[in-house]
Regions:
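N-terminal signal peptide c-region/cleavage motif recognized by signal peptidases
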Residues: 11-14
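Gly/Gly-Pro-rich "capping" loops immediately C-terminal to redox-active cysteine motifs
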Residues: 40, 58-88, 94, 98-99, ...
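Inter-heme linker and motif-flanking segments adjacent to c-type heme-binding CXXCH motifs
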Residues: 59-60, 87-89, 114-126, 141, ...
Length: 207
């Protein structure tokens, strides 16, 4: 957990998205192992609304909603910040992020980052090879060879195919809420078959 907090602190510093209050809270956590355990417990307590969609263990209850389990905590924290400041918009998440203080966001990101993804078999296994080829071509450069994600790129491995499909199609249609994303140019020439195949492949990725 100390390693996760160190990464989270480093990521916040590099992306410069948190204020001084967040930095002070994170430094306090790093200096106090007992506080780290408390932060995890506090994150668990604060997922009252999150768990209705994303599950208590971070595995979504609806296939069009992303898993948060094993997501990079730096990415999660920064996603909260973007929803809170309006850089990203979503009917539910925009309101929820604004209702959480910085400490809550840190604790929730830490909590969900420690959960384990439950990988489910694809309903379209015949698309595996095509999906793998497309993933290797357009996804792995940013999201990792196994879809493990990075500090500024989400983990894809094990995400529901329906969620990935919807997300890619939204990017392809130039979703204005993600206007600055590199994904708009990546998806603009993807066919429905390519989107379905890569989504099917991603759902089965187990790392």
């Amino acid at each position: 957990m100390r390693t996760l907090l160190f990464l989270l602190l480093s990521g916040i510093t590099s992306f410069a998205v948190a204020d001084q209050d967040a930095m002070q809270k994170l430094n306090a956590l790093l200096a106090d192992p007992a506080a780290q355990q408390q932060a995890y417990a506090a994150g668990h307590e604060r997922i009252t609304f999150c768990k209705h969609c994303h599950g208590e263990d971070g595995n979504s209850k609806r296939n069009y909603i992303p898993n948060l389990a094993e997501q990079n905590p730096i990415y999660l924290f920064n996603a909260f910040e973007k929803f809170a400041n309006g850089e990203r918009t979503d009917f539910v998440m925009s309101k929820l992020a604004k209702s959480l203080n910085i400490e809550d966001r840190v604790n929730i990101a830490l909590y969900y980052g420690q959960q384990k993804v439950v990988v489910t078999p694809s309903e379209l296994p015949e698309l595996h090879d095509k999906g793998q080829a497309k993933f290797n071509q357009v996804c792995q450069g940013c999201h990792g060879v196994n879809g493990e994600g990075k500090e500024d790129m989400p983990r894809l491995a094990g995400q529901p195919a329906e969620y990935i499909t919807r997300t890619l199609k939204n990017f392809r249609s130039k979703d204005p809420s993600r206007a600055a994303s590199i994904m708009l140019s990546i998806t603009e020439n993807m066919t429905d078959e390519e989107i379905n195949s890569v989504a099917s492949y991603i759902q089965e990725l187990d790392i």
